[in-house]
């Protein structure tokens, strides 16, 4: 069996609009990343950079399938023409490989035109929605402080009307974490069969550039932030949903964490880095070509390089990236290891 690093797909999550977003969710870990580029706060990925990324990314793959993931910030802050150009470039450089695309959105900017494109091109759409209105609107508001749930539901309705494949990404926090079954039943009621639950846990740390979240190398100031879900909450949340899911919904509704745990249990790859013994195969690329070790580690000390001067293969298979991935096995307490 080939266990070399090149036996696994090489993966970069792309941020074509950087940290730009039309919402200002209180718990967002990425919104403040724009301060890393404070001298160019309104910049987005240029067409030149897009072509460089598509060409280099496809060329770096050793597998017959290539997955592009478009993320944010809010990925729809780039116009539809940008993604149409991305598809043209993917076709130009595919070299016989199959190209798949998925895109993560808060759902508020979806239109008929966007949905027609996603349907025609076979894109998978991930929608960020934190359950029923009273849960979602607690933290997911726009920059003027207005709630966003109604706009998200309008976007989901458009996806359904156009027959676009979509799944939900829901953040579990201190507020909604106490209502697991209300949360779960909501997604069943709106016909969402693929769910990803993400616990939010952030620590505060003030930086000279205005950022307020601690990086993994920093101790943090005053413990976790108030919107964070507690360990006990998260455990009760998962157990309550699992007890219903395992009795009624296996094979009908797919909860990423449960499926990944089952895969681990039977000796298969879990498919998500949090349950794997090591990580490091999934980096992130910012609008200007900067590459970081991981989407959740976009901090200056975790920058690997830039695709205008460094190869994707060289960065993602570097000793530094390997050490980052192995640290999950060597540096974490035993209880936290995959």
What are these regions (language model features)?
Residues 20-31, 293-296, 333-338:
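Local cysteine-cluster metal-coordination motifs and their immediate loop/turn environment
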Residues 55, 59, 77-195, 203-204:
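Conserved AdoMet/S-adenosylmethionine-binding subsite of the radical SAM
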Residues 140-150, 157, 161-274, 278, ...:
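Radical SAM enzyme [4Fe-4S]-AdoMet core and its adjacent flexible, acidic
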Residues 1-116, 121:
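Conserved alpha-helical substructure of the radical SAM core
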Residues 286:
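Short, acidic, Ser/Thr-enriched surface-loop or helix-capping motifs
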Residues 270, 298-338:
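Membrane-interface junctions of multi-pass transporters
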